[in-house]
């Protein structure tokens, strides 16, 4: 009984650490604007869709694998490259400030700070194993090792969820950062729970209950994250709910590293892109 009471207490503390919202799946995207919407394209959702069609398919035969092996994807160095992969000659790819992976105009730490193979080469850092030994498929796209991990773990999660989705038994929900345009339009960028969102979206869930972490709780969480960023490990409220109207106060704008116009181009990309434009540009089958 004592164990049960402790579990309930932990759950209550967790639920009080932010704001619960029931969010339409159509408004949820990942940290690189690969949407979970029905008309979008997300590489983890494609993984699950392909496995659902053929459970005997080999990893190397999947669009998921071929996507990360594509020469255009393997050449990604910056966030700008990845968001605007389909527009190689565009202004964002060639002019202005380049954001390392893991960084955004409004701040670093919602995505864990700067990381990546190219970042390590330029800055003399070591970020490959920030989230576990070779766990990050975007650290050096094309590395088979993290893709095998993602493949196996996502399939296990798929089977678990198809037996019943009871997130609070696990003690946590998907967590998101909200982007809010001046007109009130929103996008929810996943903070935690990307694989779960991929499975739920494929299974037809129209809405999902998610937690928007409070500034204090997300800062406490980040205190345990490994990072090589020189920024303080504190996430301010504007970085949990990122508002277009506050662009002049975003970290990289305020520090003079990028212009408000460039910052907003990246911000609006999360509303205007959904991933399908990039998989189409690469000439790969979307699967779903």
Regions found by a protein language model. Give the residues of each.
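A sequence-level detector for short glycine-anchored, His/Arg-bearing signature motifs
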Residues: 181-203, 288
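Ordered hydrophobic segments in well-structured contexts
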Residues: 175-180, 198-199, 209-211
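Short glycine-/polar-rich loops that comprise or flank the Walker A/P-loop
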Residues: 206
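Short alpha-helix boundary/capping and kink motifs at helix termini
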Residues: 9-16, 44, 48-55, 65-67, ...
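Extended, charge-rich helix/loop segments that form flexible
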Residues: 69-138, 142-144
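N-terminal accessory/pre-domain segments preceding catalytic cores
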Residues: 29-103
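Membrane-proximal basic amphipathic "stem/tether" segments
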Residues: 1-55, 235-241, 249, 254, ...
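Active-site or metal-binding loop neighborhoods of secreted/extracellular toxin and effector enzymes
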Residues: 210-285
């Amino acid at each position: 009984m004592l164990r049960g009471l402790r579990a309930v207490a932990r759950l209550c503390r967790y639920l009080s650490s932010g704001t619960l919202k029931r969010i339409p799946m159509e408004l949820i995207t990942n940290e690189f604007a690969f949407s979970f919407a029905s008309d979008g394209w997300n590489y983890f959702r494609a993984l699950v869709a392909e496995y659902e069609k053929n459970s005997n398919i080999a990893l190397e035969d999947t669009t998921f694998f071929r996507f990360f092996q594509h020469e255009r994807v393997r050449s990604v160095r910056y966030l700008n490259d990845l968001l605007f992969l389909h527009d190689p000659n565009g202004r964002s790819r060639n002019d202005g400030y380049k954001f390392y992976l893991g960084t955004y105009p409004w701040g670093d730490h919602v995505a864990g700070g700067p990381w990546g193979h190219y970042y390590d080469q330029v800055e003399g850092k070591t970020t490959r194993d920030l989230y576990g030994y070779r766990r990050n498929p975007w650290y050096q796209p094309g590395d088979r090792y993290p893709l095998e991990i993602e493949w196996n773990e996502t399939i296990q999660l798929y089977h678990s969820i198809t037996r019943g989705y009871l997130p609070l038994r696990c003690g946590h929900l998907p967590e998101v950062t909200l982007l809010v345009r001046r007109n009130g339009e929103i996008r929810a960028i996943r903070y935690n729970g990307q694989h779960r969102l991929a499975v739920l979206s494929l299974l037809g869930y129209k809405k999902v209950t998610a937690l928007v972490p409070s500034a204090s709780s997300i800062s406490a969480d980040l205190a345990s994250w490994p990072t090589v960023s020189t920024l303080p490990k504190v996430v301010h409220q504007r970085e949990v709910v990122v508002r277009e109207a506050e662009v002049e106060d975003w970290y990289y704008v305020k520090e003079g590293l990028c212009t408000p116009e460039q910052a907003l181009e990246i911000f609006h990309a999360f509303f205007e892109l959904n991933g399908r434009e990039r998989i189409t540009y690469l000439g790969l089958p979307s699967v779903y």
